[in-house]
Amino acid sequence: MADKQISLPAKLINGGIAGLIGVTCVFPIDLAKTRLQNQQNGQRVYTSMSDCLIKTVRSEGYFGMYRGAAVNLTLVTPEKAIKLAANDFFRHQLSKDGQKLTLLKEMLAGCGAGTCQVIVTTPMEMLKIQLQDAGRIAAQRKILAAQGQLSAQGGAQPSVEAPAAPRPTATQLTRDLLRSRGIAGLYKGLGATLLRDVPFSVVYFPLFANLNQLGRPASEEKSPFYVSFLAGCVAGSAAAVAVNPCDVVKTRLQSLQRGVNEDTYSGILDCARKILRHEGPSAFLKGAYCRALVIAPLFGIAQVVYFLGIAESLLGLLQDPQA
């Protein structure tokens, strides 16, 4: 991508279009990932991704799977635009006379892109997680209350589905956080977000660039769109699984509400220690399957939109209406 000069407006539009399409397609899986990652040892509301989605639809309706989607759809455009544009910018700055970047320079470009995007990613994830996890917490409390009543009555436990949870809004959450904690409230978990997104970009962008290059026919200037899509999917899923332990820690730290008897954390190291001590090493892979399913098409779509140059075509039509 270093040899392909694209205007900044086109980069921003391409990133925004890709983000909107991707989030709309995979958001329910992202909701399942958040709820599974936040489950600690003890009362488990969901046993798997499919179980989570089924119970969510039964108790909260179809649109319950899209709780928090409005936040993502609003902020994913600047987030993805910053990420893709920053990576392209750093690759261009690090390249010399259009020569292929070394692996180290590709990793540095990815590191720069991951660092830039957290400006938007951290508050977006902070709000989204509260909205996504509200149903899980309400469901857990309902089940525990039902178990307590049955124990007192000596009865057998029935199947209890998740209830309709209170519905906080992103506006309400933002107002409460700003009032109680200031701007720092929206950036809770910033360190953990950097710990996830910088390594992700360091893995993703070099891997994508090399996979995309391998699939490019020698006679063509750029790879076919399906090669870009597959390269984005493979690189995205590989990077997502690689940094999933950091994502688990970030999700736990950014969750403001806790279920019954769930641990609280004072920081990244405290969170990692408690997860390892109380839940074992496998807990760091919670939601990894969901995250791979989310990231693969998300970045596959992003790269297809980016490499097809949809924004360039739109801008060209606007500049030359007779074309």
UniProtKB/Swiss-Prot annotation:
UniProt superkingdom: Eukaryota
Locations listed in the record: Mitochondrion inner membrane
Membrane topology: Multi-pass membrane protein
Biological processes per GO annotation: aspartate transmembrane transport; L-glutamate transmembrane transport; malate-aspartate shuttle; monoatomic ion transport; regulation of insulin secretion
Mapped Solcar repeat ranges: 6-93, 101-214, 223-312
InterPro entries: Mit_carrier (IPR002067), Mito_Solute_Carrier (IPR051028), Mitochondrial_sb/sol_carrier (IPR018108), Mt_carrier_dom_sf (IPR023395)
Tissue expression pattern: Expressed at high levels in brain, liver, and pancreas.
Key words of the record: Disease variant, Epilepsy, Membrane, Mitochondrion, Mitochondrion inner membrane, Repeat, Symport, Transmembrane, Transmembrane helix, Transport
Function: Mitochondrial glutamate/H(+) symporter. Responsible for the transport of glutamate from the cytosol into the mitochondrial matrix with the concomitant import of a proton. Plays a role in the control of glucose-stimulated insulin secretion.
Family: Belongs to the mitochondrial carrier (TC 2.A.29) family.
Disease per record: Developmental and epileptic encephalopathy 3: A severe form of epilepsy characterized by frequent tonic seizures or spasms beginning in infancy with a specific EEG finding of suppression-burst patterns, characterized by high-voltage bursts alternating with almost flat suppression phases. DEE3 is characterized by a very early onset, erratic and fragmentary myoclonus, massive myoclonus, partial motor seizures and late tonic spasms.
Protein name as it appears in the record: Mitochondrial glutamate carrier 1
Protein's organism: Homo sapiens
Gene symbol of the encoding locus: SLC25A22
